[in-house]
Every structure is written in C-alpha cells, then in structure tokens.
Curated annotation (Swiss-Prot):
Note in the entry: There are 2 substrate-binding sites: the catalytic A site, and the non-catalytic B site that may play a role in the transfer of substrate or product between the active site and the solvent. Alternatively, the B site may bind allosteric effectors.
Keywords: Cytoplasm, Lyase, Tricarboxylic acid cycle
Annotated GO MF terms: fumarate hydratase activity
One GO process term, biological-process aspect: malate metabolic process
Active site: H188 (proton donor/acceptor), S318
Name of the protein described by the UniProt record: Fumarate hydratase class II
Organism ancestry: Bacteria, Pseudomonadati, Pseudomonadota, Gammaproteobacteria, Enterobacterales
Length: 464
C-alpha cells in the first residue's frame, strides 16, 4: 500500500496509507511501538466504540454537539459495532499505559468514517474532529477504564459463566449417576476410608458452584464506571449530567446495570476492581486444576495406575508407544490454569504500580484479564465436551481396590480400639493377607463379628 496521505497533528506531519481509516496518532504509535504481536483485544475496542456512540448521543441531547455531527458519529460507531472495519485497529498493547493511543485510534477511525458519511475526504477534520467531536466530554483517562470494565463484564457474562455453569451441571449429573458406586478414598496419596464415587464427584461440583458465586458477586465491582471523570477525576470539560446519562445508555445497550462511580479519583488512579475480579479467576483456576489432576490420577493406567475412571479416547497419545491414550484435555485445561495464575501476578503488579491520579498499566492489565476469560471459557468448554461428559467408572477396578484396602479396618476402632486395629492393618500388610485373616489370626473378634462391622456401605455416611 502506497503511503500517500499527509496528516498534521500538534507535533508535525505524518505520512500514512491513503485509504486507511486511522489518523496521525495511530500511525505514530505504529512507528513508535513496533513491539511483538499482542494486539489490543477487540472486546475492548468494541467497548470503546460503544462509549463513543453513547457520548455522541448524550452530547447531542445536552446541546453540546451539533446534531449533524453527532448523527454521523453515531452512524459510524454503529457500523463498527456491526462488525465492519476490524482491521482498522492495529495497535499493540505495548504502548502508553493509559491506552491513549488506542482511544485516539478509535476516535480517528470513527471520525474518518463519519467524514465520509458527510461527503468529505479522509483526514479532513474540519468536518469531524477526533478530539473536538468524537472525544467530546471525554479523556482517555476515564474512557479506557470504562471500556475495561464493560469488556470485562460482558466477557464474563457471555462467555465464561455459561460454559462454567454447563461444566458444573455435568459434574452434578455424574455425582447422581455414580452415587451407588462405593470406592476407596485417598488422603496423602495413600489409601483412606471409603466413600462413593458420587460423593467424590460432588466435591468437584460444589467447588464450581462456589466459584460461580464468587465470580457473580465480584462483577458488582466492575459495574462501576469512571466515565465523566475526564482527566484526573474532577469531570473537567464534561457536563454535570453527562456521566449519569452515559451510564444509563451503556446499561441499556448491554442489558447490564452500569453505574457512575461515586469517586472517580479512585476509578482513575487504581485498577483495584479489575484486580479483585481477576482474583476470582485465579481461584477458579486453582479449583479446576485440582479437579483435572484428580481425574488424571484416577484415570491413570490403564493397567499399572489407579484406573478407577475411564476417560474418552480422543486421539493417539504417543508418537513412539502404540496404543497409548493420554488425558490430554486435563493437560490442556491445567496449562490454561497455569497461564491464568501467571496473568493474575502480572495484573497484581500492574495494579500496585499506578501513581498519583492515574494507573498507567492498563493495556497490559486488560489484555491479561480478557485472555484469562477467553482461554478459560474455551478450555472449560473443551474439557466438558471432550472429557467430563464421557467419563465412566471402571467398576472392576474400583471393587478390587475396595476389597484390598487396609483402611476398612477403621470401622473396627470404636469396638476394639485404635491400637488393635492398627496391628490388624500392619499384619495384613506385612504378610499380604486380608484384614479378616489378620483379625482372626490375632483373635480379636470372630468372623461373624468382622463381617457385621466391616461393611463399606455402612462407612460412607449419606451417599446422597
């Protein structure tokens, strides 16, 4: 593409492609920050465009922006929101920490689309100006934090929570299906007293149920938006009614109650709300990683591991060992959880690094946040569909381990005491005999008493 359009800004002239929709500040960012490939997430761009649309409507309503200009900005914003012009937002996240260059990228693209709608030529900002008209009543310092919160809320509600709720249901269904299957428990990776497979799976269901609650509750933190605070939180150059009107419109568009922050100084100077919400994603990752590790252990084998669960065979597992099948979905979701936990560290460091009236680590913070939501959403969907739904019990293996377990001796403790019960277990283990044989050899109780007292079905509490 030939570089044959000249634009001027407050620093000087800038050359850029003739037909591109962005302007000088975007082009300068392309030149100055040619760093890696991490582009600004489109979810954030979408939220920024929503804000521009709402700002134009409010400014028009308050008689702060000429109707003709406002309508052109609104129309241009609607076209972008419909899915057009996605390639007009080329900037990477490694830019100014306030997100100013991305805010200006959006301003310039909307301005040029609006200019064209009004019959002008790209770059003729006397018709529609990126700052004076598209960015009216706004600052990057309140717009970018607002877009962060909007994109975060929508990604959680539309992507993560629906997939997480489906996974929770799958575990609930399995817990009911497996409620009559008695198996041996394990603590410290050693044999323990029995429980049902349904009870074991119910703990996974309950973990997800609690995590869903944590995430839903935390969304309230990011439902407050900074819009109207402008540069440092005072609301300079914004109408006193602007923030409330804009919040109301954003709520209507997104079918979510966004409220104007009561203290915009805090909203601009910190990323505490995003940090808080992402901590729930870290917590979720810790829970899912525990669940996936349990499934990996329980399905290990098929002959020399635990092998109590049978997982779907999705693909060959080895390039050298024929017939091998690996728990690949568990491995995939575990890696995702590791990444989210790492993202949480980066977000936390970014959050504590804001100085005075503005946090300037925002592009990195929101990139990591949205990446966490995206990979968790996709990973959970895949884990559920390709693994969890297809999990089956290996009844033969489960019965074998239950029969051989030494920890069934625990049921004798109330009747013969801890020390004698321990002697039975040790003798059975050392001589490779059954608990019953060891008990009779030590002459602690009769065979009939043993059969009455050592019954796994009486050791599992409420199996429902």
């Amino acid at each position: 593409m030939l570089i044959n359009r000249i634009e001027k800004d407050t620093i000087g002239e800038v050359e850029l492609p003739k037909k591109c929709l962005w302007g000088s500040q975007t082009q300068r960012s392309i030149y100055n920050f040619n760093i890696s490939t991490e582009k600004m997430p489109y979810e954030l761009i979408h939220a920024l465009v929503q804000i521009k649309l709402v700002a134009a409507k409010v400014n028009k309503d308050l008689k702060l922006l000429e109707e003709k200009k406002a309508d052109a900005i609104i129309k241009a914003s609607e076209e972008i929101l419909s899915g057009k012009y996605k390639d007009s937002f080329p900037l990477v996240i490694w830019q100014t920490g306030s997100g100013t260059q991305t805010n200006m990228n959006v301003n310039e693209v909307i301005a040029n689309i609006a200019i064209k709608l009004l019959g002008g030529k790209y770059g003729d900002y006397s018709i529609i100006h990126p700052n004076d008209h598209v960015n009216k009543s706004q600052s990057s310092n309140d717009v970018f934090p607002t877009a962060m919160h909007i994109s975060a809320v929508l990604s959680l509600k539309k992507n993560l929570l629906p997939n997480l709720i489906k996974l929770k249901k799958s575990f609930y269904d399995k817990s009911i299906l497996f409620k009559d299957i008695i198996k041996i428990g394990r603590t410290h990776l050693q044999d323990a007293t029995p429980l049902t497979l349904g009870q074991e799976v119910s703990s996974w269901y309950c973990m997800l149920k609690k995590n869903i609650k944590y995430i839903k509750n935390s969304i309230l933190c990011i439902s407050e938006i900074a819009l109207g605070g402008t540069a440092v939180g005072t609301g300079l150059n914004a109408h006193e009614k602007y923030s409330l009107k804009a919040s109301k419109l954003l709520s209507e568009i997104n079918k979510h109650n966004f409220i104007s922050s009561t203290n915009k100084f805090e909203s601009l100077s910190t990323c505490d709300a995003i940090v808080k919400v992402h901590s729930t994603l870290k917590n979720l990752s810790i829970s899912i990683m525990k669940i996936s590790n349990d499934i990996r252990w329980l399905s290990s084998g098929p002959r020399c591991g635990i092998g109590e669960l049978i997982i779907p065979e999705n693909e060959p597992g080895s390039s050298i060992m024929p017939g091998k099948v690996n728990p690949t979905q568990c491995e995939s979701i575990s890696m995702i959880c590791c990444q989210v936990i790492g993202n949480d560290s980066a977000i936390g460091i970014g959050g504590l690094s804001g100085n005075f009236q503005l946090n300037v680590f925002r592009p990195m913070i929101i990139y990591n946040f949205l990446q966490s939501v995206r990979i968790l959403s996709d990973g959970i969907k895949s884990f559920n569909k390709k693994c969890v739904i297809g999990i089956k019990p290996n009844i033969k293996r489960i019965k074998k381990f239950l029969k051989e377990s030494l920890m069934l001796v625990t049921s004798l403790t109330p009747h013969i005491g801890y020390d004698k019960s321990a002697k039975i277990a040790k003798l059975a283990h050392n001589e490779n005999i059954t608990l019953k044989e060891a008990c009779l050899k030590l002459n602690y109780i009769s065979e009939s008493q043993f059969d009455i007292l050592v019954r796994p079905e009486n050791m599992i509490g409420n199996k429902n």
